Every structure is written in structure tokens, then in C-alpha cells.
């Protein structure tokens, strides 16, 4: 029986005030940018947080719509509207990715052009208080955030970079290119930023990001580094995980207070809903061992390899008939993985792996 190739598209959640809009960018041939909006009830105006997404490997039109629910829920509780734009060439946004290549500084600036278009749209929204804004970015989105901070809208009071950068593995001295990009940005930036990088970041370990950070500061940039040590099997996914909140939220909240942005919880209904509990680790097989998974054919094993590349909270489910499905991030990836699998498995699916542990046992049916 054929399985489901990964996670299904997630519909907007009305209980989070979530909607999807398409915003034109400002290029010679404009493209529509798929943009997720989370808003509290009421007319506003609300302070605004913009979150810039990372870059998956492969075809970026297949990249899921970014939501970053751990962060979105924290800001919603405090009365913010949250805007998460997919840049050109990503997910359902039109066109091809711009600024790709070893010119990492130019790549970040090309991505920042997309964000300038989104901010211009935000300025026209009656629900947005553009005097009180913050911007966060993860991975490629962190690079985008630092590039944007060179010429920001004056309403942005805080910029936060989570594991920001861009990495290439062939035909590129990307470590030097990243250092040069950060030096360039630091020389042109007059607003402070807060940076989070983990010890076991598979993309940007301390040996890479340390010199890049020093280049940024030496060039004149004002940045505070939070080196938070190891996180799970890969610190690069920290921001996407609810477990990561313990590392970054308090520090960001302190910075919000310093710049007179709101931090009091005014909408507690946006707190995270209870999620399905994970089964205990079974030790059935190492989670990375694709060949040990029972029941799956080639498509399912290929899907499992994709699953293994996803950071943060994740789950993979299988069924005796060959059905499979996975999910990562969001409020309840365990339940979503089972739901995805059971669209074909008809109730026979069981969890095989959760996060970095195998939970399947030989007694599972």
C-alpha cells in the first residue's frame, strides 16, 4: 500500500486568528508572496512581529508554509500581530528564489528586498501599529533579518537572529563568504541585534559563526551573542521547537522591555494546547537506520530520509500495510503524523519515531 509522502499542508487555524494573504513584491516582474498572518481579536492597532523563514534543501516551492507556532503563540498572548512571509520562490510564493549563490551578502540583501515589500504592505493595514515592531529570523531568515536591519523601517525596535546564515557545500568558500557578508552588514547597521547560536549547530558551529560574529562587531555592528550550548541532536532547529522557548524567550522578553514593547500576557487563550504524549523510547533501532524500519517500501524509506532532515519536534508513523506519514513542528506533530498516515492506514498506524528516538516495538501491530 502506498504511503503519504510526508506532511500534509496545514490549514489556517481560526482559533489563532490565522489567515493567508498574497502580497506583491516590488520587482520588475512582481510576484505574489504567500504570507501568514496571526492576529488577536479586535480592530487593533496591534504591535507587529515579522518572522523570516529558513531555506530547506531541494526545490523550495515544496517547502511548507512557515508558521513558527512556538514564537507566534508567545507573541499572540502578548497582543502582537505576527506576520510570516514566504519569500519569492518559496512554498506557494511565485517566481524563483533570488540571490542564490556564493555571494552570501548579496543573497541576504536580495531576500531583504522581499521584506521591504511586506513591510510596505503592513504600513497600509489599519490593524498594524508600525511604531512598535520587532523582526526575528531563523537560518536563511536570520541572514535576511540582518540584511534588512541595514536600512530598516523606523518602527522596528528589535532584531533577533536565530542561527542565521547561508551554507554551501560545493564550489564555494562559504565560511569566508559568510564572514564577509556579516562584516558588510555590520558596517552599515546602526540598530542593535540579538543573536542565538548553539554549540551543536550542524550548519553554523562555533568555529564558523564565531569569526563571522567578530567581523560584524569589528565593522561597527552592535550585536549581543547568546551561545546556548548543545540542543537536541542539532541546535539549528532550536527556534522551531517548543523546547527552545526555555532558551530564548526570557532573553527576548527582557529586550522587548528595554525598547518599550509589550510583554504582559493579555490573551492567555493563545497558549499552547495540550499535545499527545510520546511513547517511551523502545531501542528498536537507531533512529537514523532507515533499513531497520518495518513495512515500508522505497517511497516510504525515501520519505523517512526527508523526515530525518527536519529539525525540532517531529514524528513518523507507519502501518503494517505500508502506509506512512510524518509531521514536524507546530502544536502536535505526533497526532498530525498519525493522522497523515491513517488517511491510508485507516486506523492501523503507530508511531515509529519521535524527535530523535525510536518508539516502535516488536509488539506493535
Task: Please describe what each predicted stretch is.
Residues 90, 243, 265-365:
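Secreted/extracellular ectodomain signature
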Residues 127-138:
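Alpha/beta-hydrolase fold nucleophile elbow
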Residues 45-54:
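Short beta-strand element of the alpha/beta-hydrolase
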Residues 158, 164-220, 224:
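The feature captures the conserved acid-bearing segment of alpha/beta-hydrolase catalytic domains
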Amino acid at each position: 500500500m502506498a504511503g503519504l509522502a510526508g506532511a500534509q499542508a496545514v490549514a489556517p487555524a481560526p482559533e489563532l486568528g490565522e489567515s493567508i494573504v498574497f502580497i506583491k513584491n516590488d520587482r520588475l516582474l512582481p510576484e505574489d508572496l504567500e504570507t501568514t498572518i496571526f492576529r488577536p481579536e479586535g480592530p487593533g492597532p496591534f504591535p507587529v512581529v515579522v518572522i523570516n523563514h529558513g531555506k530547506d534543501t531541494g526545490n523550495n516551492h515544496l517547502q511548507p508554509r512557515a508558521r513558527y507556532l512556538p514564537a507566534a503563540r508567545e507573541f499572540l498572548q502578548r497582543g502582537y500581530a505576527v506576520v510570516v512571509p514566504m519569500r519569492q520562490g518559496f512554498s506557494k510564493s511565485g517566481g524563483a528564489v533570488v540571490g542564490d549563490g556564493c555571494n552570501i551578502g548579496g543573497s541576504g540583501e536580495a531576500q531583504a528586498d522581499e521584506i521591504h515589500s511586506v513591510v510596505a504592505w503592513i504600513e497600509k493595514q489599519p490593524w498594524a501599529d508600525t511604531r512598535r515592531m520587532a523582526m526575528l529570523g531563523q537560518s536563511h531568515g536570520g541572514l535576511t533579518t540582518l540584511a534588512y536591519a541595514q536600512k530598516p523601517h523606523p518602527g522596528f525596535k528589535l532584531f533577533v537572529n536565530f542561527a542565521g546564515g547561508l551554507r554551501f557545500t560545493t564550489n564555494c568558500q562559504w565560511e569566508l563568504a559568510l564572514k564577509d557578508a556579516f562584516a558588510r552588514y555590520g558596517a552599515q547597521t546602526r540598530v542593535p541585534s540579538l543573536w542565538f547560536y548553539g554549540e551543536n549547530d550542524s550548519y553554523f558551529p562555533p568555529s564558523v559563526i564565531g569569526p563571522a560574529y567578530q567581523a560584524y562587531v569589528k565593522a561597527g555592528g552592535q550585536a549581543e551573542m547568546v551561545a546556548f550550548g548543545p540542543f537536541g541532536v542539532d541546535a539549528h532547529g532550536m527556534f522551531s521547537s517548543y523546547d527552545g522557548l526555555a532558551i530564548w524567550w526570557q532573553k527576548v522578553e527582557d529586550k522587548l522591555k528595554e525598547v518599550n514593547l509589550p510583554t504582559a500576557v493579555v490573551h492567555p487563550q493563545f497558549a499552547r494546547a495540550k499535545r499527545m504524549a510520546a511513547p517511551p523510547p523502545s531501542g528498536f533501532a537507531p533512529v537514523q537506520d532507515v533499513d531497520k524500519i518495518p513495512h515500508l517500501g522505497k517511497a516510504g524509506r525515501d520519505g523517512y530520509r526527508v523526515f530525518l532532515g527536519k529539525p525540532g519536534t517531529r514524528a513518523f508513523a507507519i502501518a503494517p500495510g505500508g502506509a506512512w506519514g510524518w509531521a514536524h513542528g507546530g502544536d502536535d506533530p505526533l497526532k498530525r503524523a498519525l493522522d497523515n498516515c491513517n488517511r491510508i492506514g485507516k486506523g492501523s498506524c503507530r508511531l515509529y519515531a519521535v524527535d530523535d528516538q525510536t518508539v516502535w516495538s516488536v509488539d506493535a501491530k
